[in-house]
Amino acid sequence: PCIKRYCPEVEAATRFTILNEDLLLTTEDQRIIKGNAYLCDSSFFDVFPRKILMGEEPHSGLEKANNAYISAKLLKVLGNDILGKQLTWKVFPNFHITVAGVFEDFPENTHLPKIDIAVALPTIGQIMGDGRDNWLGNDRYSGYVRLHPGTDPKTLEPNIKHMLYTNAPMEELERSGSQFYLNLKPVNTIFLSSEYNRIMNIVFLAFAFIMLAVAVLNYILLVVSSVVKRAKSIATYRCYGAE
């Protein structure tokens, strides 16, 4: 979010990190629910707009530690009276979150992880080390920015560099031979140009060719086997006088 101070081209910025996949939570009436929980900052729904169906406005709601927003899918399980109620982490009974609102479900055709529960980022210190203000070693976060319409991402590069040299120990890193830089990647190119996806495409393609080759070889072996069997049958018939 600091990027907005250095880059006026940025309309909104957010970051989030995983809390727990398949998080088991216990309601006040001892029901157990399960969902993917992520720690999100207060600008999360500015970058990824979702209609807030019930509850507090996220700009204030996600600023308060232990507040959380649940998906409409979970609302169907918990009921409309869940606002303001506490949910307890089954594994850590001393950790509680309060339902501050309900957001519209994210569509299935998104590269974002499945988010059922958005927990206010200030909660992080109760679960793990609070490195929100660290400029180095924060690779656990996913960061996104929304640019003003018509903005060329390349125009942000000088200001991003200035931001890094102002806040991070860049000279010290360079002296040690390390590199640290930030670049912007359009969301709509992630699926098409991700190195991981390219590798996986090659792996699946190779696997498909192997399966096809095995199927062809099996067919050839079956044909050869049937021909040999047929030849043996003919030889047997001739031994007994068949023409």
Annotate the PLM regions:
Residues Y38-E57, N67-Y196:
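Mid-to-C-terminal secondary-structure elements
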Residues T17, E57-A65:
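Short linear loop/turn motifs
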Residues R31-I32, R198-M200, R230-A231, E243:
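Membrane-helix interface segments
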Residues L217-E243:
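Intracellular coupling helices
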Residues K64, Y141, S178, N218, ...:
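Exposed loop/turn and edge beta-strand positions of beta-sandwich/beta-sheet ligand-binding modules
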Residues I3, L74, V99, N159-M163, ...:
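Structural preference for long, well-ordered alpha-helical segments in enzyme cores
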Residues S194-M211:
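N-terminal membrane-entry
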